[in-house]
């Protein structure tokens, strides 16, 4: 599948290709990144990010997040009554959710590693 590293894209479960996962990474699925919002974390356009399914992540961890049917990859920060999805590129604004908006945000899993696309 694919995940946005920029503006969220429609979340679809599909197999695009099979990838070899490095032996030291324990994951449930992988996604191809599209965009440049996570470049300062070392995740670039077309990189493959490995996701371990879990409904929560620690403050500041990178996660695959579904927002009202769309998916994005961001650092997650929790504050009382607020969830912030923070890009790792100053060209992008944080995505801040409060109150009823929080019901639309679902952590799909934690990014446990990634490999760079060479092409």
What kind of feature is each model-predicted range?
Residues 1-44, 59, 70-71, 78-82, ...:
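Short, positionally conserved secondary-structure boundary motifs
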Residues 3, 55, 89:
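Short, flexible active-site-adjacent loop segments at beta-strand->alpha-helix junctions, enriched
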Residues 31, 63-65, 85:
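Well-ordered beta-strand positions enriched in small/hydrophobic/aromatic, beta-favoring residues
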Residues 48-51, 64:
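Hydrophobic beta-strand signal
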Residues 51-58:
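Short acidic low-complexity segments
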Residues 65-66, 93-102:
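Short aromatic-glycine motifs in intrinsically disordered, low-complexity regions
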Residues 72-96:
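PDZ-domain C-terminal substructure recognizer with occasional recognition of PDZ-binding tails
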């Amino acid at each position: 599948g694919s995940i946005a590293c920029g503006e969220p894209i429609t979340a679809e479960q599909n197999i695009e290709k099979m990838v070899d996962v490095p032996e030291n990474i324990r994951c449930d699925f992988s996604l191809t990144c599209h965009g440049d919002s996570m470049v300062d974390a070392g995740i670039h356009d077309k990189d493959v990010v490995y996701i371990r399914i879990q409904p929560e992540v620690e403050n500041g961890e990178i996660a695959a997040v579904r927002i009202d049917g769309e998916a994005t990859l961001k650092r997650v920060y929790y504050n009382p009554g607020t969830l912030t999805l923070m890009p790792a590129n100053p060209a992008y604004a944080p995505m801040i959710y409060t109150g009823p908006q929080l019901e639309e945000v679902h952590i799909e899993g934690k990014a446990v590693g990634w490999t760079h696309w060479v092409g």
